[in-house]
Amino acid sequence: MSARITPQTPALQALRMRLHAQHQPVVLMRTDCHVCRAEGLAPRSQVLIIAGDRTVQALLYQIDSDLLKTGQIALSEAAWDALDIHEGDLVQVRHPPLLESLSAVRARIHGHRLQTTELQAIVRDVVDGRYTDVALSAFLTATAVLPLDMQETIHLTRAMVDVGDHLQWQAPIVVDKHCVGGLPGNRTTPLVVAIAAANGLVMPKTSSRAITSPAGTADTMETLAPVDLDLDTLRKVVEKEGGCVAWGGAMHLSPADDIFVRIERELDIDTQGQLIASVLSKKIAAGATHIVIDIPVGPTAKVRSRETAEHLAHHLSEVAASFGLVLRCLFTDGNQPVGRGIGPALEARDVLAVLRNEADAPQDLCDRVALVAGAVLELGGVAKEGDGIRLAHETISSGRAWEKFQRICAAQGGFREPPQALYVEPLLATTTGRAVHIDNRKLSRLAKLAGAPESSAAGIQLQVRLGDEVTSGQPLMFLHAQTSGEMAYALAYVHDIGDIVNIEP
């Protein structure tokens, strides 16, 4: 978007209001501001803010108070950062240019399939900040009501890759993995990266922070080492150690994905085409050539039936093949959490227990890691077909994975032990019997109410698994919180929702 301050347009003095509105640029102006009157600007309209060669499109709110003078404009943090200005700098305000790509969104609402150029224009405008949340919601809802077909999914994936940065590696094979999700815990990524790198593979893993879950991979890894790496640092870490676990949000890889995901979470929609474009665009941008997809299947996981899992795997494979990617999907048990910890630090402790070969390391996490890492090793060509799981277990038991993980952490800025919560309370069984059902969604909700992931030490430590015999008064789990208020809030939720773990006599 090209615009510059010109003498003909009145300028306003910029003030930093230190308002955090997620990624939404917001500005405040007085209703009697001469620019508002001259331009005919109304509350909640989109405006273009110009500061030298930089521009940002923002949502306008108007006020009637002495908080601002008529010649001033207050900017949110997102707007301030985008313009890179200083307190008191002059900016201009105009109507934004016509958003032509919205015509394609309207066509999609009416059932028309979109071509490459139309999806490219939409994604470009989204990344440039020209789409309001309403317009984004319209686009995503249209692709949910009439799901993306194969060609649209391929076109959208390509468009999402094209607007971001790309990593390229000299190695002919670059491996990656992704878990479709829906399971608390299941923190396999740091372990898989360590195993892959210890066996000579290149695995530049970029991961997300939690959006609605108690922990993302980046949140967990951050309790062990810095994850906020720029592209140059990430490249140096991978070139030195063969792998990394970094926060993808610190880079510009598939930037449209973060925007789409934020709206999808608010709308509580999760469509197959968007999921495929989201996953594969990030893998392609990171330079991956061989990818393992873990698809947990269970009644409270994201994918709830084998049929749905097979359909998703087929479409993932088709889209991946169109980009020359080698992909393998694994269908795994999604009936209960993997590992004992739910929350960044508690999940990190599970990771360390497995890496250090501790006697009480969660066996289910160790087995899941061996399954996923084994597939990565086989796909990467360092293990024969059928021998990957054995090699993964050997890499852990020999200490090679732990040694490599420490080296990766050191390269990323230094290893640290995860923090411990100040408050810990047991949740006790009220009856004797066998554990027959664990509600993943209730567990995730409870861990978040305890403070995760913002309080990295908060969360849940499970003490039972499906099939375990339980005695009344026995701890089913321990609740961890950093403040007494968060602990009380979480305990109140437990009182209101009933059983999280169902026990049958």
UniProtKB/Swiss-Prot annotation:
GO biological process, one term: pyrimidine nucleobase metabolic process
Enzyme Commission identifier(s): 2.4.2.4
The keyword Cytoplasm belongs to this UniProt entry's keyword annotation: no
Signal peptide: none
Keyword Cell wall biogenesis/degradation: no
Entry-linked SMART domains: PYNP_C (SM00941)
Family, similarity comment: Belongs to the thymidine/pyrimidine-nucleoside phosphorylase family. Type 2 subfamily.
Protein's UniProt name: Putative thymidine phosphorylase
